[in-house]
Amino acid sequence: MTAQPQVLTIRRPDDWHVHLRDGDMLKTVVPYTSETYGRAIVMPNLAPPVTTVEAAIAYRQRILDAVPEHHAFEPLMTCYLTDTLDADELERGFQQGVFTAAKLYPANATTNSSHGVTSVDNIMTVLERMEKLGMPLLVHGEVTHSEVDIFDREARFIETVMEPLRKRLQGLKVVFEHITTKDAADYVREGNSLLGATITPQHLMFNRNHMLAGGIRPHLYCLPILKRNVHQQALRELVASGCERVFLGTDSAPHARHRKETSCGCAGCFNAPSALGAYATVFEEMNALAHFEAFASLNGPGFYGLPVNEGTVTLVREESVMPETIAIADDTLVPFLAGEAVRWTVKR
C-alpha cells in the first residue's frame, strides 16, 4: 500500500473564476486570493457592471491597491457582455491587454446579472469579433426562462444555446464556467480544443442533499445550484481523468452574513480561504493527485495561451479548522467549510 503523501508542492496556481466585489468587501477578500494564486480571472458583475476599458482599468487598480505588498498577484480583467455592447470597445480593451476575456451572463441568471444578455442573437456581431480576435468567451451556462426547473437549466443551456452557438462560430474559444452536471461534464470531455471548463470546490465536494437534507444550509447555496449525487460524481470523475481542458475556478463569491442567512438569501460561496486544500482533498479521494498540479496550475494557462507562473505553493497534511466567521467592516463573512476541519493546508 502506498504511503499517504504529507506534502504537496505544485507550481503556483491561478484562479480562473473569482468575484472580488468592491469597496470594503474587496479590501477584505482580495488577500485571500492574492496570497495563494498568481493570477485570477475577475468577474465583471459589479453594480454597474464593467463594460468599458476605462471601468476595467479603474477596477483593476482598486484590486491592486488591496493586494498586500508581499503578494505577487495579477488580476485578469473581463468585460461584461450586454445586448448593446460596442464590439470596437471590446476589441480595444483586448488589444490593449486590459480585457483578457468577455463574460456572458444570461439576463438574471445570478448576482448582478440584470444587465446580461437576453439572447445571443443580440450580441452575434460582438461574438464574431471575438472569434476573429481569438478572445475567450466565458459563459454562465444556464437558461433563465421561468418555466425551466432550476435543476435543469444547465442541461437545457447546452442544448438550446451552447451547442448551436459553437456550431455557428466554430473558431470561438469558450470556457463553460462552473459546470455542475453530468451533461456538462460529458459535453466538455467530448469537446474540441476550443472548449474549456472550470469546476468549483463546492460542486466537487457536495451535492444538493448536503444543502437541503436535515435543514437548509445557506452557505452552500450558489448558482448554478448544487445538483444530485450522480452529477457530483461525474464532475469528480472528469477532474480525476486528467482532462487538459478543465481547470481551477473557485467562483468564490462573498456576501455579508446577513445577506446569506435571510428569508431570501444571496447565491455564492466564499471559498477563497480554503479552496486549494479542498481541491487537493478531492483529488486525493479520487486517487488522482498526479493530475492535481495540472488542474490547478497548468491547464488554465495552456488554454488561455499564457505562461505558467513562476514559483511554487506547498500544501501540508495538517488538519486545521476553518474560522466560523471573517470580519468585514461592520459585518461578517461566513467562509466555505466554516468551523470544519480541513485536511490540506497551504503552508504560509
Swiss-Prot record:
Molecular functions per Gene Ontology: dihydroorotase activity; zinc ion binding
GO CC field: cytosol
Segment forming the signal sequence: none
Keywords: Hydrolase, Metal-binding, Pyrimidine biosynthesis, Zinc
SUPFAM superfamilies: Metallo-dependent hydrolases
GO biological process per UniProt: 'de novo' pyrimidine nucleobase biosynthetic process; 'de novo' UMP biosynthetic process
Annotated EC: 3.5.2.3
Cofactor: Zn(2+)
Keyword Metal-binding: yes
Enzyme class label: hydrolase
Catalytic machinery residues: 251
CDD domains per the UniProt record, alphabetical: DHOase (cd01294)
Residue numbers carrying N6-carboxylysine: 103
Binding residue positions for substrate: 19-21, 45, 140, 223, 255, 267
Domain of life: Bacteria
InterPro entries membership: Amidohydro-rel (IPR006680), DHOdimr (IPR004721), Dihydroorotase_CS (IPR002195), Metal_Hydrolase (IPR032466)
Binding site residues for Zn(2+) 2: 103, 140, 178
Catalytic activity: (S)-dihydroorotate + H2O = N-carbamoyl-L-aspartate + H(+)
Residue sites binding Zn(2+) 1 per the record: 17, 19, 103, 251
Subunit structure, interactors included: Homodimer.
Alphabetical list of HAMAP family matching this protein: PyrC_classII
PANTHER family listed in its UniProt record: DIHYDROOROTASE
The protein's name: Dihydroorotase
Taxonomic lineage from the root: Bacteria, Pseudomonadati, Pseudomonadota, Gammaproteobacteria, Enterobacterales
Gene: pyrC
